[in-house]
């Protein structure tokens, strides 16, 4: 199979598998069919032996593990489009969950996340980000592994306690800035983030597997809870992309991708993001395709994505856009101009007329050139539309081989344990010093203590007796006075 069927008008609208790593865009207003389009693409890639990663935000993508139950609406769509090869079926699915509730746990270490993404997660300012950079440098220089949040908290405490010493070597470190980061870490931890950081850390190759019959495994990140923390959601997905870019070897253009990565609600990645962060996203998207990874952004409005990212998305599916405001009109104009024009279509006008499940589609051809834009209906998915059945969900969870691999957290010796030993030793030394000081103080106090009356009388008598004895001795030696 060299192409996948994604839509139909008079003809089948296909996507070239060899061009699937040139990335893509699924855009459109709420309720226009983006989620179903995502599901259809995931199904088609899986059929072709391409593993898929996607996030299930609304709870309606994990149902790809269930076959479609035909209804009148689906049957009518199949008839209208003259689709004869449709077969309701389920697809091989693995469920994952950062919080370890609805899927196998997904973890990363603090070191893997790195200072830039961590600063984004904690929403640090420039000064605080600089302190975090220094923390990672100190960690590297001193062999302090940063695996989980308590490792980072311990290192920050060490930096605050010895700020002047570290400042002389690494640059200015203020206790106030360190304290601000510590407070943000506590807040972050209270949101459940401690579940994400630690070991065993995710091996990305576990996302890149095929079933025994050669179909790509569809990895579904259960994200309905994660999505309530949008910065964590978007930064986590970017971390995954970054790790794929850093770990996978260069392969160039393949017959089909090694993995297709769907980034739903992609606008969150760029919302309030600093320029350096956006630049990193652009770089990762540009370069990860040579690692055999295709990235497909899903968002309501194409203008929510930077032009530098949009320009790299070769396969485009545009559902209806509404133009109620000047910004909406700008989006319609922008979307229409990105397509290779079809003389039979007024793209700017059609975008507002598209029905649910209908889209404007342009994919790259064999030469890597955009095809002329076509108006077509997305094929009905072969898996269930809606929320996954609880019994089937439990079966999928039970059968996930990575539940055992990642189910139990590991807490090996790292920065926290090493620094705790140092803190404990310092406390012992402080206690010994305090005891010695107290003992010395007690001895001196005893010497200065006023004598009692009895002690004074005894001392006087002894002194008098001593003087008398002394005189007797002297007389015995030198002779007494003559009378």
Per-region residue spans from a language model:
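The conserved Walker
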Residues: 26-30, 273, 302
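Short, low-complexity, glycine-enriched hydrophobic/amphipathic alpha-helices that associate
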Residues: 445-483
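Pre-Walker A (Motif I) flank of P-loop NTPase domains
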Residues: 11, 19-24, 215-219
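P-loop NTPase motor domains
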Residues: 42-52, 59-283, 353-354, 415
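Conserved P-loop NTPase motor module
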Residues: 105-111, 122, 317, 350-457
